[in-house]
Amino acid sequence: MSLRKIIHVDCDCFYAAIEMRDDPRLAGRPMAVGGSPDHRGVIATCNYEARAYGVRSAMSSRHALKLCPDLLIVKPRFEAYREASREIHGIFRDYTELIEPLSLDEAYLDVSDSQWYSGSATRIAEDIRRRVARTLHITVSAGVAPNKFLAKIASDWRKPNGLFVITPAEVEAFVAALPVARLHGVGKVTADKLTRLGIETCLELREWSRLALVREFGSFGERLWGLARGIDERAVHNDSRRQSVSVENTYDTDLPDLASCLARLPELLDSLNERIARMDNSYRPDKPFVKVKFHDFSQTTMEQAGAGRDLESYRQLLGQAFARGSKPVRLLGVGVRLRDLRGAHEQLELFPPK
């Protein structure tokens, strides 16, 4: 099998990070996102200040407050998290279409065939982390490895705000020293059983034959045998086709007025047209749209069916979008919705001629 380059990206305390970004008063103190302790609420996530007290995800809010009486619990704002996730995935798509989301804040990327940075997965991961921090003002951790199992372990190795790389030459030694409790799919019950069998590390697990592991653990024994050797052939599954292509830029200094925003349009459109030109012919550009994020992180998107993709059409859309806030702008984006010609063809093929 050809060498694969897999990146696992995991946002650091995602929901809490968005809340602290949007309300800086929350930063630096123990806080969590979750339900009310008076209504059997649970913690969805918490920041690292709260984790220092032992607060964890899926813990009851009432118990979390016992551990940390000063804990501030805020209600979740899922639309804000979904919007941030969409922005992050937009960054991912600049490097590859092979993206497998695991949740709003976590995804695998297969960059094996990416031409960015001469195919360097490490530099791609570095650039993704830099762009997310610059654009969204939150941090992500990333792991780079030859397969999904190792990439996920690597992303957790230097959390928060870290990057860890496992090269093909390092796989053998890295996995040998790995505790079996870190293996994908090994929960508490399996970990306890492995401990009773005297197996603490993958090196010790390698001493067991494939047949012996299957006898002890059923079909999962086959999986354990492979993981102990760093083997994971699972592909990165991309379940959805692209719906749009866009270009965004976050400016070092806020754009104070509409005229300043309009002056930035030509360079954005040049970049957009370059990306459209690189797309395959299974997509057709459709509705143009403009995205504006104001200095206070409020944002709006304006699109129009039937409009052209020329400079004047985007100028009109930008003018309408800016009027919704009429305040300094920190980010501008231009894009176009896509018509999926392959999807349309596949639907027609469901009913072949008789």
Swiss-Prot record:
Reaction catalysis annotation: DNA(n) + a 2'-deoxyribonucleoside 5'-triphosphate = DNA(n+1) + diphosphate
Keyword Repeat set for record: no
Active-site residues, as the UniProt record annotates them: 106
Give one Pfam family. Answer: IMS_C
SUPFAM superfamilies found in the cross-reference section: DNA/RNA polymerases, Lesion bypass DNA polymerase (Y-family), little finger domain
The UmuC domain is annotated at 6-187
Signal peptide range = none
Q: Which UniProt keywords apply?
A: Cytoplasm, DNA damage, DNA repair, DNA replication, DNA-binding, DNA-directed DNA polymerase, Magnesium, Metal-binding, Mutator protein, Nucleotidyltransferase, Transferase
CDD domains in the record, alphabetically?
A: PolY_Pol_IV_kappa
Give its localization: Cytoplasm
Residues carrying the site annotation Substrate discrimination: 15
Judged by the first EC level, this protein's enzyme class is: transferase
Give the Enzyme Commission number.
2.7.7.7
The entry's Mg(2+)-binding residues are 10, 105
- Give the cofactor note: Binds 2 magnesium ions per subunit.
Cellular component terms per the entry's GO annotation: cytosol
Which cofactor is essential here? Mg(2+)
Tagged with keyword Cytoplasm:
yes
Share an example GO biological-process annotation for this protein.
SOS response
User: InterPro entries given for it?
Assistant: DNA/RNA_pol_sf, DNA_pol_Y-fam_lit_finger_sf, DNA_pol_Y-fam_little_finger, DNA_polymerase-Y, DNApol_IV, IMS_HHH_1, Rev_trsase/Diguanyl_cyclase, UmuC
- Subunit notes for this chain? Monomer.
NCBIfam families noted in UniProt: PRK02406.1
Family membership: Belongs to the DNA polymerase type-Y family.
UniProt-recorded name of the protein:
DNA polymerase IV
Which source organism? Pseudomonas putida (strain GB-1)
